[in-house]
A protein has these predicted regions:
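Conserved catalytic cores of phosphodiester-cleaving nucleases, focusing on short active-site segments
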Residues: 61-63, 68-76
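Short acidic/glycine-enriched loop/turn segments that link adjacent beta-strands
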Residues: 54-57
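Metal-dependent nuclease catalytic core centered on acidic motifs
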Residues: 1-48, 77-158
Length: 158
């Protein structure tokens, strides 16, 4: 991933200090991508927006933090509809998912959706959530814990 970010086509997005792109600022998803990227920068990441080629399932971002590079597919949660469907549809795009929660989504349902995602996708590594100024990272190990629902809801609902 480091080599991808060093590709000469990445330039700073106009008006930003830690968000890079290879173009596509006028893509229909750009505002949602930029919103999530701003939150990632607030949490200490440098963000690289990846191109979105037609007919090809790819991740949306590479985050760099303290020398580590991670690739994420963005799913923005606008309403109270099923996050589970969005998570399952992301299988094959990236092994890390970023859920940008912009609505009041039930913590119990969200925990169940995340657990089901890890069960359905053996390659899944992490589901990262942004909810307001809060960030919650859930890995496979945590989702398999018998205490997962209680621990997740405590973090999510506080």
């Amino acid at each position: 991933m480091e080599k991808i970010t060093q590709y000469g086509g990445f330039t700073l997005v106009k008006g930003e200090t830690a968000i890079y792109s290879v173009g596509g600022e006028y893509d229909g998803d750009f505002d949602a991508l930029l919103d999530a990227a701003h939150k990632a920068v607030e949490h200490g990441n440098t963000v690289y927006l990846l191109p979105n080629p037609r007919n090809c399932r790819t991740a949306d971002f590479i985050f760099r933090k303290k020398g580590a590079y991670m690739m994420y597919d963005l799913k923005t949660v606008y309403g109270k509809g099923s996050v589970g469907t969005q998570l399952l549809n992301s299988i094959g795009q990236s092994n890390r998912i970023l859920l940008n929660i912009t609505s009041d989504y039930n913590g119990r349902l969200l925990a169940a959706d995340i657990k089901a995602y890890f069960e359905a996708n053996r390659n899944a590594v992490e589901v990262l959530l942004f909810k307001g100024k809060k960030t919650i990272s859930v890995n496979r190990y945590a989702a398999q814990s018998p205490m997962f629902y209680r621990q997740f809801r405590k973090k999510y609902e506080q």
